[in-house]
Regions:
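Glycine-rich, highly charged phosphate/nucleotide-binding loops
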Residues: 106-122
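Acidic beta-strand-to-loop metal/phosphate-binding motif
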Residues: 55, 130-139
Length: 265
């Protein structure tokens, strides 16, 4: 089965959080049963202690995990980025990275640091025996995941690394242990140089890279859809885009930027 067939035949994993657009257009999060976490504790009780850091894809997910102590006494940190858009630099989280990413988001360095870098302080300052990454299969999540993995390699992290993905349709946490060694190179190829990777990667990441590179083109499927439906309101377009392109995983910010770009033409 090639990656395209794999992607078409498999529901995208949405990394624990089920996002719905409510009547006001704001996101609300449906947190599923805690029983899965109890089962996870039975299988991997060592992941619930103080020497473990959970890195979560976004602030909403982070707050829910932290407030509910879903992973027991372990630490939590959010990665509040959208690495699937805007330029990136080879060295992750250094001064040049921060400046480049801030400019891409039309943000000040101070504002970017407060939103993205400061919440990751535990990752930079504490030594953990294990880091658990909570990221899904869509492009948004996979590019964020790739960035964190690149940082772990660049910082010569020596502990264990687990990836926890969540299947929205049946609420099952899918856990695999990752071996560091190639992700900084993959990150550089894909997110810095915008090329396909020369490394062998899982079908999920292969497909995400493929879609990421496709989204860099002017005539990608999302842009075509917006162009054909530009008479719809932004809110109507957002609702349709979230429904039609789950494998992209963009949030409202990324889509609104594309919508405005096309409507201004």
């Amino acid at each position: 089965m090639n990656p395209r067939e794999y992607q078409l035949n498999k529901m995208p994993i949405q990394s624990f959080v089920k996002l719905n657009l409510n009547k006001e257009g704001a996101f609300k999060m449906n947190i599923s049963r805690k029983i899965e976490f109890e089962q996870l504790r039975d299988r991997k009780s060592e992941l619930f202690d103080k020497e473990v850091l959970n890195i979560l894809n976004g602030q909403v997910m982070y707050e829910e995990f932290k407030n509910e102590k879903l992973m027991g006494d372990s630490d939590y940190a959010p990665f509040n980025e959208a690495m699937c858009v805007n330029p990136a630099t080879t060295q992750v989280f250094d001064e040049d990275f921060i400046k480049t990413r801030a400019e891409g988001h039309n943000s000040s360095v101070e504002s970017y640091t407060k939103k993205v870098i400061d919440p990751l302080e535990k990752l930079f300052t504490k030594n953990y025996k294990c880091i658990v990454l909570w990221f899904g299969e869509d492009v948004f999540c996979q590019m964020n995941l790739l960035t964190i993995l690149s940082h772990l390699e660049q910082s010569v992290y020596e502990g264990k690394v687990y990836l926890n993905s969540f299947r929205e349709d049946e609420f099952k946490v899918n856990q695999i242990e990752l071996e560091l060694g190639k992700y900084s190179s993959i990150y550089n190829e894909v997110l810095v140089n915008h090329k396909k990777t020369s490394h062998k990667v899982p079908p999920v990441m292969y497909q995400a890279i493929d879609l990421f590179l496709e989204m860099l083109t002017e005539d990608n499927a999302v842009m075509k859809f917006i162009s054909k439906n530009k008479d719809l309101s932004t809110q109507e377009l957002l609702t349709k885009l979230f429904h039609l392109f789950p494998t992209i995983g963009y949030g409202d910010t990324q889509y609104i930027e594309l919508i405005n770009k096309i409507k201004k033409k």
